[in-house]
Design a protein with these regions (language model features):
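The feature marks the mature, well-folded catalytic cores of soluble enzymes
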Residues: 37-385
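Intrinsic-disorder-associated, low-complexity terminal segments enriched in Asp/Asn/His/Tyr and depleted
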Residues: 10-13, 21
């Protein structure tokens, strides 16, 4: 009996010690995890936050722009002027001397000083999708660039040179922030929108499209987005794909996020328009969307441009594809005075303190994109020593 009592007491003591040990390990693990979260306290800033610079990847004769280079050059010069007057501008191009000769006579002295032309081979011009995505640390302001794989929107187009541009700019010390390798995951900048508070907006049409991250489920992709972008919440939109959009439904053509929990979106009031039903379904999804606290978002509806065609093909013209820079919004126009003016009016409601700068985007839309697609902003912050 004595032996049994001692054995039982020893067994109980052992069990208590084991539980205490497990509890201690859990506390240490949780503490370490918390410290790691604090150390890696990064977030994807909203586009309207202060920027360091914007990247353009200049068109050239060896791209699909060859048939109408003069028209697209004029548009790029207008974008460059608007940007370089307000912040630094990086231009990636395989032909630096040609770009300088074309651009510099059109720039003020201030804009020239703000412009850096970098030698970079390129397949195309869509900086939004091949440039790094920049995070900023919420505590110390340090920057981290995420280098994702760009594969020509699901292997539709050649992208080998474009996929190297960010790393080349980093190697040449033109981009100076720390760069994190995410080349095992396909993601384009035009596929995501951030509110700067931990919520990322995207579309299921794009991220679930073939030849991007094919073997992954939507839930798995969501977890990857949260991990890589340091996001707390992913909002998936399931409607709104524009006719002629070869990105498989980038969110920056249909829905944009603005300050004060405002969502700008492309509307359509013409029931005869082939895009009406899908855009209406998207509108209804946005109306049902709630913030984390249960409140509604402020919704502002942008007009739809009248249908634009090129050789019988409808082009994905949209007013949602604007660029926010320091102190200004650079927005596309389509030579449709009534719609262009209405778009500016709505944008001014979302950005009342910003100057509105109109840029004719008729040349860009011939290649199925617009101003936001052609640019990538780099947020202002500190570079890790």
């Amino acid at each position: 009996m004595f032996f049994c009592t001692i054995f039982a007491e020893d067994k109980l003591h052992s069990a208590i010690c084991k539980q205490a040990y497990i509890a201690l390990v859990c506390i240490i693990f949780a503490k370490g995890k918390k410290e790691k979260m604090i150390k890696d306290n990064y977030i994807l800033p909203a586009e309207w936050e202060e920027q360091e610079c914007v990247q353009l990847t200049w068109p050239h004769k060896d791209t699909d722009w060859a048939p109408y280079l003069d028209d697209i050059y004029e548009m790029f010069v207008n974008m460059a002027k608007a940007i370089a007057e307000r912040e630094r501008l990086i231009i990636a191009t395989p032909h630096p001397e040609e770009v300088e000769a074309m651009l510099y006579p059109c720039l003020s002295e201030k804009a020239k000083e703000n412009t850096k032309i970098a030698l970079c081979p390129s397949n195309d011009t869509w900086a939004r999708d091949h440039a790094p995505i920049t995070l900023r640390n919420r505590e110390n302001g340090e920057l981290k660039m995420l280098d994702f794989k760009f594969n020509g929107w699901g292997e539709k187009f050649a992208a080998d040179k474009d996929n190297e541009i960010g790393r080349r700019l980093k190697a040449d010390n033109i981009l100076t922030a720390e760069m994190e390798d995410n080349l095992d995951f396909v993601l384009e900048g035009g596929a995501i929108e951030s509110d700067g508070k931990g919520t990322i907006f995207t579309t299921s049409q794009c991220l679930m499209a073939p030849h991007r991250n094919q073997s992954m489920t939507q839930q798995e992709i969501e977890e990857e987005l949260k991990k890589r972008l340091r996001a707390e919440r992913i909002v998936w939109l399931d409607h709104g794909n524009l006719v002629g959009d070869d990105t498989d439904g980038h969110i920056d053509t249909i829905v944009r996020i603005a300050p004060d929990d405002t969502i700008l979106y492309m509307g359509c009031d013409d029931k005869e328009d082939e895009q009406y039903e899908d855009l209406k379904a998207m509108e209804n999804q946005l109306k049902a969307l709630r913030k984390d606290g249960g409140e509604e978002y402020r919704l502002l509806k942008l007009p739809s441009p009248e249908a634009i065609y090129d050789d019988g093909e409808r082009l994905p013209a949209t007013y949602a594809n604007f660029l926010i820079i320091n102190g200004a919004v650079v927005y596309p126009t389509y030579r449709q005075p009534k719609n262009d003016a209405e778009a500016e009016r709505i944008l001014k409601m979302a950005f009342p303190e910003h100057e509105m700068i109109a840029v004719d985007a008729c040349a860009a839309i011939r290649q199925h994109g617009s101003i936001h697609c052609l640019t990538m902003q780099y947020t202002k912050g500190k570079v890790k020593k």
